[in-house]
Amino acid sequence: MASLSGPISPTNLEMFKPGVEELNPSKLLLLSNHQQGMLYPTILGSLELLSFKRERSLNLQRDKVCLLHQESQLLKLRGTGTDTTDVPLKQPMATSVNCCHDGIFTILEQDRMPKTSMAPTLTESSGSLVTRLMSIPRLTFSIGTQVAMRLFRLGFRLARYSLRVTILKAQEGLHLIPDLLHAHPVEPLVQDRAVEPILAIEPLPLV
């Protein structure tokens, strides 16, 4: 204690100096990185910071290339009537016959398109209709004629009017049968059948 009460020498002052630790430059860099919010470690003298920057720039360049590719696809499809508001459409699967190299479908030639002829169908339907009309039994006409004559004698106006219209239509159909036969001939299998001839019916009084 006596030594402490004496005069203070410079060596004693050096002993009482607070110990200040010199900071390493690498620790300073780590501290600055932590303050800036960087999550990757950086050591002085390493190339991690440069590699990170290089990788980030490559990712940005890759994104730019993808954006340019999408824009080129949109510009390519703009003149073909395709909706370009959304992401570019994928080229549909198609054969080389009706699809060009740029994915645009073309209409097939008219010669290659299948053609279906309706002529045989019309001939068969009309021939069967004519055959059916010609093969109506004579008994049906006789019964209808008798019913019509009775109604005319009774004098019902509504019944006479309806029967008169029916008879006129039937006579018109009988007159049109020869024209239908010339326009649409009956099939050979139908012609071999024995068709009962239609007898001439006396004109009924329409009054």
Swiss-Prot record:
The entry's cellular-component GO terms read: virion component
Cell compartment(s), UniProt: Virion
Protein name, per record: Protein I
One Pfam family, please name it. Corona_I
Concerning InterPro entries, the annotation shows: Corona_nucI (IPR004876), N2-like_embe-CoV (IPR044311)
What CDD domains does the entry give?
A: embe-CoV_Protein-I_like
Q: Which UniProt keywords apply?
A: Virion
Say if the entry is tagged with keyword Disulfide bond: no
Supply any other comment: The gene encoding this protein is included within the N gene (alternative ORF).
State the species of origin. Answer: Bovine coronavirus (strain LSU-94LSS-051) (BCoV-LSU)
Q: Which family does it belong to?
A: Belongs to the coronavirus I protein family.
Question: What superkingdom heads the lineage?
Answer: Viruses
Q: What does this protein do?
A: Structural protein that is not essential for the viral replication either in tissue culture or in its natural host.
